């Protein structure tokens, strides 16, 4: 399946079956007189057990947030005239939903018995009166948002051929607890938890490819050292503690290697180390400052920042340090590059008064500005390459935002006191 770019579903209703049953995965289809598909999330129903209005509310809220961000749909509120108690085929009439202009319908129900919960979801093609997808999940009432996000991922798989990233987490840096600490939250801002509690400065979190670990830089012992943390146990290990900077660590996509910035030999240079911090290998060797390495998805190249030409610019080199070439030719201050998981785009920040986020092809073409409001930094891709998370000062303070890969749908997801920055999106959980 080679065509899994972000889907802009603007499609004639008569083409829905072709979309859903394509053997080639996602297809981008446009035609004169077409319209964006209308999707409605009906109110979740109690199928048995105890009444749990919070489960119903959070289910609908999470599904609607996911589908609005997804972008291919016009998401509408459920029609009171069309609403009915049934969620399974034969338990409700499609005609009122057609009359309300609905193309795709999500129905769901729950059964809560004590601390056990079963949730059932259905996705329907209203135009044809057919069921597209049916799923059942078990868990606890506290799992409701995770389960709803899981079904959103399944919706994207059914309609595009690739699962969504909505079960992912975002790790970020925040001052909400005082000193800069690493926090973790659902991608939509819910279920926030503080990871580091060392009362020191902690920066630049990055997820392992498995999503089970992060690396980050901490000043807890005075020097900016690189640490690795297991997310499920909380166990931490210092893996790079050379004198000077041990920072901007980035896991390779195969999980075997970490690229980072070290200043142990003088100025800041790009190195690689093994996942346990051994076998340091220097990749750059200039008098310039070189920082912020990030891997290509095939592990063959590294994009990084260097001021070897006087101002910070983005460069690309082979993973062994050879074949260095300049990527950005516009702007005088370009930083924080990150390669798309699909390999087709590199996102970065450019200083233009404040900072704005750009995306560029790896060959240097199609350099496109994605943000304009406030100062925007630290862009990172979702695991499917359809979305980007970043920090922004718009609206006062500094918060974490998400947007589609083309810059549309910019939405704040972090709240509360303090300044939030340096987000990174986990692999699917």
UniProtKB/Swiss-Prot annotation:
GO biological process: cell division; protein import
Residue segments, region Disordered: 362-383, 407-429
Gene3D superfamilies: TolB, C-terminal domain, TolB, N-terminal domain, Tricorn protease N-terminal domain
Keywords noted in UniProt: Cell cycle, Cell division, Periplasm, Signal
Signal peptide: 1-22
Broad class of the protein's primary localization: periplasm
InterPro entries named in the record: 6-blade_b-propeller_TolB-like (IPR011042), PD40 (IPR011659), Tol-Pal_TolB (IPR014167), TolB_N (IPR007195)
Annotated localization: Periplasm
Self-association and partners: The Tol-Pal system is composed of five core proteins: the inner membrane proteins TolA, TolQ and TolR, the periplasmic protein TolB and the outer membrane protein Pal. They form a network linking the inner and outer membranes and the peptidoglycan layer.
Protein name per its UniProtKB record: Tol-Pal system protein TolB
Organism encoding this protein: Geobacter metallireducens (strain ATCC 53774 / DSM 7210 / GS-15)
Classification lineage: Bacteria, Pseudomonadati, Thermodesulfobacteriota, Desulfuromonadia, Geobacterales
This protein's encoding gene: tolB
């Amino acid at each position: 399946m080679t065509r899994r770019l972000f889907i802009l579903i603007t499609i004639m209703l008569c083409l829905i079956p072709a979309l859903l049953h394509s053997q080639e995965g996602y297809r981008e289809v446009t035609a004169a007189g077409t319209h964006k598909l209308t999707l409605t999330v009906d109110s979740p129903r109690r199928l048995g057990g105890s009444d749990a209005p919070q489960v119903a509310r959070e289910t609908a809220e999470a599904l609607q947030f996911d589908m609005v961000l997804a972008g291919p749909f016009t998401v509408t509120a459920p029609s009171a005239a069309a609403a009915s108690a049934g969620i399974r085929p034969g338990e409700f009439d499609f005609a009122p939903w057609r009359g309300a202009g609905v193309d795709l319908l999500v129905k769901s129900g729950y059964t809560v018995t004590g601390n056990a919960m079963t949730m059932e979801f259905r996705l329907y093609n209203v135009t044809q009166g057919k069921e597209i997808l049916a799923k059942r999940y078990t868990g606890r009432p506290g799992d409701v948002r995770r389960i709803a996000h899981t079904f959103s991922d399944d919706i994207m798989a059914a309609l595009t051929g690739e699962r969504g990233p909505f079960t992912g987490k975002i790790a970020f840096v925040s001052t909400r607890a005082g000193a800069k600490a690493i926090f973790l939250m659902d991608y939509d801002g819910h279920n926030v938890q503080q990871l580091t509690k060392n009362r020191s400065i902690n920066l630049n979190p990055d997820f392992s490819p498995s999503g089970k670990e992060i690396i980050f830089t901490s000043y807890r012992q005075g020097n900016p050292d690189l640490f690795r943390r297991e997310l499920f146990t909380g166990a931490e290990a210092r893996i790079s503690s050379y004198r000077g900077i041990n920072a901007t660590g980035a896991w390779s996509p195969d999980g075997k290697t970490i690229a980072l910035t070290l200043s142990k030999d003088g100025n800041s240079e790009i190195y690689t180390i093994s996942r346990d911090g051994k076998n340091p290998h220097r990749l750059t060797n200039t008098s310039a400052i070189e920082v912020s390495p990030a891997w290509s998805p095939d592990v063959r190249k590294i994009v990084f920042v260097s001021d070897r030409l006087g101002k910070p610019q983005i460069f690309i080199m082979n993973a062994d340090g050879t074949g260095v070439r300049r990527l950005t030719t516009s702007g005088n201050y370009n930083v924080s590059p990150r390669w798309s998981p699909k390999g087709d785009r590199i996102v970065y920040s450019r200083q233009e008064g404040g900072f704005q986020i750009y995306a560029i092809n790896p060959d240097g073409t199609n350099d496109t500005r994605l943000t304009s409001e406030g100062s925007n930094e630290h862009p990172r891709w979702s695991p499917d390459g359809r979305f980007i998370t970043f920090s922004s000062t718009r609206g006062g303070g500094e918060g974490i935002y998400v947007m589609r890969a083309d810059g549309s749908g910019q939405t704040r997801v972090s709240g509360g006191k303090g300044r939030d920055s340096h987000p990174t999106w986990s692999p699917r959980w």
